[in-house]
């Protein structure tokens, strides 16, 4: 389990190879290689972001997330609710080491209501190291370590009950 008591995200259980795989339709969403924002836009008229928390934090405030990022004096933390047609679809938490916030990527601290995916996937220098699949009761989650010009950031996404991920008929939360 992972969780930060100050986070908008509840504790998440990250699944290992021993866990049963996600249903194929759900896995298709969770393993999405492109922008989740763009994928959501295909299922609604309007996607928008409501920032919940944006601030610098220290490594000891990250909990187990620190294992996925290099040591840094500070990390930029951004927590948001992403909505499709005014329905909350996703909770997002981004942790960015100070060293990633250089040059044009310093703009990451000023995204405000701009979806992170719009910024990240406009870069020719974006790569993804991995996607981990997780659960929180009946809800699905994913965690990705991404790199901008080789510099890391960690993105955790929890798909809320109204998310189109569950509209496939597979693993619809109650």
Curated annotation (Swiss-Prot):
Alphabetical UniProt keywords: Cytoplasm, Lyase, Pyruvate, Ubiquinone biosynthesis
Highest taxon, organism lineage: Bacteria
Leading EC class: lyase
GO cellular component term of the entry, any: cytosol
Subcellular location: Cytoplasm
GO biological process: pyruvate biosynthetic process; ubiquinone biosynthetic process
Keyword Cytoplasm: yes
Main location: cytoplasm
Pathway entry: Cofactor biosynthesis; ubiquinone biosynthesis
GO molecular function: chorismate lyase activity
Enzyme Commission number(s) of this protein: 4.1.3.40
Binding residue positions for substrate: 36, 78, 116, 157
Catalysed reactions, as listed in the record: chorismate = 4-hydroxybenzoate + pyruvate
Record-linked InterPro entries: Chorismate--pyruvate_lyase, Chorismate_lyase_/UTRA_dom_sf
Short name of one Pfam family: Chor_lyase
Subunit structure: Monomer.
Role this protein plays: Removes the pyruvyl group from chorismate, with concomitant aromatization of the ring, to provide 4-hydroxybenzoate (4HB) for the ubiquinone pathway.
NCBIfam families: PRK11655.1
Entry-linked PANTHER family: CHORISMATE PYRUVATE-LYASE (PTHR38683:SF1)
Family listed: Belongs to the UbiC family.
Name this polypeptide is given: Chorismate pyruvate-lyase
Gene name tied to this protein: ubiC
